[in-house]
Curated annotation (Swiss-Prot):
<feature type="binding site">
    <location>
        <begin position="85"/>
        <end position="88"/>
    </location>
    <ligand>
        <name>AMP</name>
    </ligand>
</feature>
<comment type="similarity">
    <text>Belongs to the adenylate kinase family.</text>
</comment>
<comment type="subunit">
    <text>Monomer.</text>
</comment>
<dbReference type="GO" id="GO:0005524">
    <property type="term" value="F:ATP binding"/>
</dbReference>
<dbReference type="Pfam" id="PF05191">
    <property type="entry name" value="ADK_lid"/>
</dbReference>
<keyword id="KW-0418">Kinase</keyword>
<feature type="binding site">
    <location>
        <position position="201"/>
    </location>
    <ligand>
        <name>ATP</name>
    </ligand>
</feature>
<dbReference type="InterPro" id="IPR007862">
    <property type="entry name" value="Adenylate_kinase_lid-dom"/>
</dbReference>
<keyword id="KW-0963">Cytoplasm</keyword>
<feature type="binding site">
    <location>
        <begin position="132"/>
        <end position="133"/>
    </location>
    <ligand>
        <name>ATP</name>
    </ligand>
</feature>
<keyword id="KW-0545">Nucleotide biosynthesis</keyword>
<feature type="binding site">
    <location>
        <begin position="10"/>
        <end position="15"/>
    </location>
    <ligand>
        <name>ATP</name>
    </ligand>
</feature>
<comment type="function">
    <text>Catalyzes the reversible transfer of the terminal phosphate group between ATP and AMP. Plays an important role in cellular energy homeostasis and in adenine nucleotide metabolism.</text>
</comment>
<dbReference type="GO" id="GO:0004017">
    <property type="term" value="F:adenylate kinase activity"/>
</dbReference>
<feature type="binding site">
    <location>
        <position position="36"/>
    </location>
    <ligand>
        <name>AMP</name>
    </ligand>
</feature>
<dbReference type="InterPro" id="IPR027417">
    <property type="entry name" value="P-loop_NTPase"/>
</dbReference>
<feature type="binding site">
    <location>
        <position position="123"/>
    </location>
    <ligand>
        <name>ATP</name>
    </ligand>
</feature>
Length: 215
């Protein structure tokens, strides 16, 4: 199966990506990881990407599409793949289609903004170990202290409410239009499923909803 996962930052895409990659034995293809790997391996696409990044510019869609095409041609993508963080915009989705990359299902994890702010603003992290907590859903035994070490927990800058709201604004401007784009594509194309799941449900309920919709 070839998937695209859509949803705002904090909607739970990471959790569902882990589930889907395991369930279908497919790799999760993150554009960030691909870029880093291509630059490290000094592939032609990687060298081009590095030039843009060194100049402080965004890497072009053409380069990202080239990286995606190279990556999905690798043997571990024989059963399919899950695209993570791409496409982010309608022009990128058009470019992906024009490049002949076929997708079986687009899964949208739908969570209201207010819930996302609540989820992310409640996160606390133990910097040394990476252990994460949530003041409502997974609180530490002692407020603001790590369970194992008793060290202070911190709130990451990008989990602060005002930062989360800024990220949601960018998501609604750039990425949310993909929802309409892929819904329209699925109506025209019997091979493409568009699945919208209520991401406020418990994790295992979200997983079951996705699997039943894929049948």
């Amino acid at each position: 199966m070839k998937f695209i996962l859509l949803g705002a930052p904090g909607a739970g895409k990471g959790t569902q990506a882990q589930f889907l990659t395991k369930e279908f034995n497919i790799p999760q293809i993150s554009t960030g990881d691909m870029l880093r790997a291509a630059i490290k391996a000094q592939t032609p696409m990687g060298k081009m990407a590095k030039e843009f990044m060194d100049a402080g510019k965004l890497v072009t869609d053409e380069i990202i599409i080239g990286l995606v095409k190279d990556r999905i041609a690798e043997p571990d993508c024989a059963n399919g793949f899950l695209l993570d963080g791409f496409p982010r915009t309608v022009p990128q989705a058009d470019a992906l289609k024009a490049a002949g990359v076929e997708i079986d299902a687009v899964i949208e994890i739908d969570v209201p903004d207010s819930e996302i702010v609540n989820r992310m603003a409640g996160r606390r992290v133990h910097p040394a170990s990476g252990r994460t907590y949530h003041i409502t859903y997974n609180p530490p035994k002692v407020d603001d202290k790590d369970n194992e070490t008793g060290d202070d927990l911190i709130q990451r800058e990008d989990d602060k409410a005002e930062v989360v709201l800024d990220r949601l604004k960018v998501y609604h401007e750039q990425t949310a239009p993909l929802i309409g784009y892929y819904k329209a594509e699925a109506e025209k194309n019997d091979q493409l499923k568009y699945i919208q799941v209520d991401g406020t449900q418990p994790i295992d309920t979200v997983e079951k909803s996705i699997l039943s919709a894929l049948k």
